A protein has these predicted regions:
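N-terminal cap/lid segment of alpha/beta-hydrolase-fold proteins
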Residues: 1-40
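Conserved G/P- and acidic residue-centered "switch" motifs that form tight phosphate/ATP-binding loops
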Residues: 23, 80, 119
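Primarily recognizes the serine-hydrolase "nucleophile elbow" in alpha/beta-hydrolase
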Residues: 47, 103-138
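Conserved SAM-binding loop
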Residues: 18, 76, 119
Length: 138
C-alpha cells in the first residue's frame, strides 16, 4: 500500500509497487517537487539501491535536494532488499529490473519522458546495467 507524506513543500509517495517482467514487485518511493500549481510532468532522477531507499545519507538527502530543484526523484529498493519482493542475488537481475523500472516510470503521467540515474558504488553500477538495455527514456 502506498502512503503519502508532505514535508517542506514536497510530496512523497512511499512504497509504490513496480511490476517486473516476471511478476516480482519492487518498492519505489517517489519525491515530487513543490508544484506551485504546476502538476508536471517533470524530468525524473532514478536511484536504485540495495542499501535501503530511505537511507538518509545517500537517498533521502539527494532526493530532497533534486525535488526542491524541479525533479521527481524515484528511489527503489532492488530485488530482494528491504520493501522489494524477490531474492537478492548481486548483479543478476539489475539489467532487466533496471530497464523495466525505467520503462514503468517513463510511462507515468508525472514523467516528461526524460530519466537520469544517480548514485555511487553499487548504485552507480546498476545505472550502467540499466542503460545498456537501450530504453528510450534514459
Amino acid at each position: 500500500m502506498t502512503s503519502v507524506f508532505k514535508t517542506g513543500g514536497l510530496r512523497v509517495e512511499y512504497d509504490m509497487k513496480v511490476p517486473m517482467r516476471d511478476g516480482t514487485r519492487l518498492s519505489l518511493d517517489v519525491y515530487f517537487p513543490n508544484s506551485d500549481g504546476d502538476d508536471g510532468p517533470w524530468p525524473v532522477i532514478l536511484i536504485r539501491t540495495p542499501y535501503n531507499n530511505q537511507m538518509p545519507s545517500v537517498v533521502t538527502q539527494s532526493a530532497t535536494f533534486f525535488a526542491q530543484h524541479g525533479f521527481v526523484v524515484a528511489a527503489q529498493d532492488v530485488r530482494g532488499r528491504f520493501d522489494s519482493e524477490g531474492e537478492f542475488t548481486p548483479w543478476v537481475n539489475e539489467y532487466d529490473d533496471g530497464f523495466d523500472t525505467v520503462e514503468w516510470i517513463g510511462s507515468r503521467d508525472w514523467c516528461d519522458g526524460n530519466i537520469g540515474m544517480h548514485g555511487p558504488s553499487y548504485v552507480g553500477n546498476v545505472q550502467w546495467q540499466a542503460a545498456s538495455m537501450g530504453s528510450k527514456y534514459l
